[in-house]
Amino acid sequence: MYGFFTLTQLSDTSVTFSKQAFASMNIRSLFSLFSSDLAIDLGTANTLVYAKGKGIVVNEPSIVAINKSNGEVEAVGKEAKEMLGRTPGNIVAIRPMKDGVIADFKVTERMLNYFIQKAHGRKMLVHPRIVIGVPSEITQVEKRAVIDSAYRAKASEVHLVEQAMVAAIGAGLPITEPGGNMVVDIGGGTTDVAVISLAGIVYSRSVRVAGNELDEAIIQYLKRKYNLLVGERTAEHIKMTVGSAFELEKPLTMEIKGRNLIEGVPRTITIGDDEIREALAEGISTIMNAIRVALERTPPELSADISDRGIVLTGGGGLIKNLDKRIRQETGLPVSIAEDPLACVALGIGKMLSDFKLLRRIAIE
């Protein structure tokens, strides 16, 4: 009366409206109300998960230990990496990612599900929107595999972005400005080289030579020269301790323990940085060639910008001793290493969670 609703009428109207609003929501929209958005750097060597409002909450090896007798997951991440080369016959440690893309779909799905649950404190009803970084030259089939794995791991929405682009964002480069930025992201499975301007990739190249390939080169070198067999973890440790891309001012040596392939017993040798540099030479040359090609194909105006701003290195491979010096010598350009190279991709994707306008501009799927 008097043109107003009574309390009962207002209550009835509210209930009707609520029912209509609820009915109009699709399931994904409803789940999103109770979710926390995630940014995932799904790497060949490591997976990093960035939670909106929290930062990086997961940083673990992309490894899953599976029990072959029953197909059960025994361990994921750090715990699974500890098992590499040490598992009993019925347990196998698997890297489900190879060269930056999914090699084992089912294991990747289980790994993703584990990391998503861990990022959300083991909550069961979690259906986040997810943004995932992928290599530049990924095929449609490989894209579909990443998207399907994320949905099967309970994502409500999935977006893909190029790793080189988000690595540049994570390194703090002004990618939306009308000037050239060059980033070289050396991960575990791929090296992505990109020239970026106005939030777009002007040129990009992805080569499947990166950290894991360099580790394998060390393993093969020690086999060939010393008949010494070492595992992946040891090879990675050698690479980061005495590995280099250019002659060091002060020579380094390191004791290496492994199994002699002829005698079949444990042996220890001492190796110098010059030998490991020789082992890494072919892989480093492939990366250098990708950088040279990118520079040759960059438009003149952007080349001038890169001459001023230089090249920025991201990813774990950027930490190889004197790689920046090698690139500087061969290109004549300034070279810098990002402040937190290992986290650049995850940090860059994480920024997209708060800037969906920019995400829409750079997303490739």
Model-flagged regions — what are they?
Residues 2-186, 194-312, 318-365:
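Nucleotide/phosphate-binding catalytic cleft detector across ATP-hydrolyzing
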